[in-house]
């Protein structure tokens, strides 16, 4: 059953390169949209929030390498191949590569009512330096 669901999603997904000289692709599948992103060593995004009146949020799926996901005020969670993280709307977080390893992941935006993304401050070198 899981394989069939994965195949159906793959059949309906459309990939488009969204940046030059990077491994970032836009993905559109049914009502979901997202990015397949490759992150070199030491790469991480800023803190951000996926807002929505209802529904919304983000799903992260590690497809290669090793990375981290962290909710503000909590310990970072290591992500390895196959790990899937469901982030509800209105949760401040960041995600990116481990300090010593490349990381590739799918970042899927969950459909929601009146959804938007708010990009915030960078993850500090001090915060990032705590990762193993």
Residue map of PLM features:
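Asparagine-centered strand-capping/turn motif at beta-strand->loop junctions
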Residues: 96-98
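Short strand-connecting beta-turns/loops that link adjacent beta-strands
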Residues: 30-31, 54, 74, 100-101, ...
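Glycine- and acidic-residue-biased ligand/ion/polar-headgroup-sensing regions
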Residues: 55-67, 72-73
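Conserved short histidine dyad/triad with adjacent acidic residue
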Residues: 36-54, 89
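A short, N-terminal "cap"/entry segment at the start of jelly-roll beta-barrel domains
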Residues: 1-35, 46, 116-132
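Short acidic-glycine-tyrosine-enriched beta hairpin
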Residues: 59, 73-90
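A short hydrophobic beta-strand segment most commonly corresponding to one strand
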Residues: 59, 86, 100-119
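A cytosolic small-molecule/anion-sensing beta-strand core signal
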Residues: 38, 63-64, 80
């Amino acid at each position: 059953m899981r394989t069939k669901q994965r195949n159906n999603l793959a059949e309906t997904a459309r990939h488009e390169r969204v940046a030059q000289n990077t491994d970032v692709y836009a993905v559109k599948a049914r009502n979901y949209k997202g990015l397949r992103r490759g992150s070199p060593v030491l790469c991480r995004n800023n803190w951000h929030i996926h807002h929505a009146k209802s529904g919304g949020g983000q799903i992260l799926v590690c497809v290669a390498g090793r990375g981290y996901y962290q909710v503000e005020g909590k310990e970072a969670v290591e992500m390895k191949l196959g790990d899937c993280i469901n982030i509800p709307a209105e949760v401040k977080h960041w995600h990116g590569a481990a300090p010593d390893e490349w990381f590739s992941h799918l970042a899927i935006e969950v459909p929601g009512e009146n959804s938007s993304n708010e990009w915030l401050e960078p993850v500090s070198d001090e915060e990032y330096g705590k990762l193993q």
